[in-house]
């Protein structure tokens, strides 16, 4: 008899958080930023939880320490990053898998266009993306881990600290 509640708990943990959160925001909207505005790629500390004490002088992005920043000025580089993200999202749609509920986003893309700032927080561990526009969560989607190598290659070319 105890197996039934255990089974229900396991199903809830495995499948309860596997769907897409909020309204999906396609990376095609990122294409608007290929030739204008700011486009910034971040590596964030996914190991420190937002509730933990923050060391003095730490720069944060949505509660997580920024480990590295790379401003992407080239339209070609922006397109390469966007296409990698689009491919990851297409992979996730073709091969849906239950995602885990970790959301420790170690990568982010910020676009700033006029008075609109949009952040895409990306966790390649649980394959989830959360989208924030002007400080409010506006959507989310899923991805595969495939874009991570492209993102990391751009970050390796950037400033080692920020």
Where would I find each of the regions flagged by the language model?
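Bacterial N-terminal signal peptides
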Residues: 5-14
């Amino acid at each position: 008899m105890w197996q039934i509640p255990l089974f229900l708990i396991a199903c809830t943990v495995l499948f309860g958080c596997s769907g897409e959160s909020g309204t999906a925001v396609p990376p095609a909207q990122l294409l608007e930023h290929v030739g204008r505005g700011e486009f910034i790629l971040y590596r964030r500390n996914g190991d420190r939880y937002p509730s933990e004490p923050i060391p003095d002088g730490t720069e944060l992005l949505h509660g997580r320490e920024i480990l590295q920043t790379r401003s992407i000025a080239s339209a070609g580089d922006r397109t390469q990053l966007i296409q990698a993200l689009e491919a990851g999202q297409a992979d996730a749609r073709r091969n849906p898998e239950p995602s885990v509920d970790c959301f420790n986003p170690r990568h982010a893309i910020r676009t700033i266009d006029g008075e609109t700032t949009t952040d895409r927080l990306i966790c390649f561990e649980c394959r989830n993306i959360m989208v924030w526009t002007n400080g409010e969560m506006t959507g989310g989607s899923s991805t595969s881990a495939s874009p991570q190598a492209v993102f990391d290659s751009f970050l390796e070319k950037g400033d080692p600290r920020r």
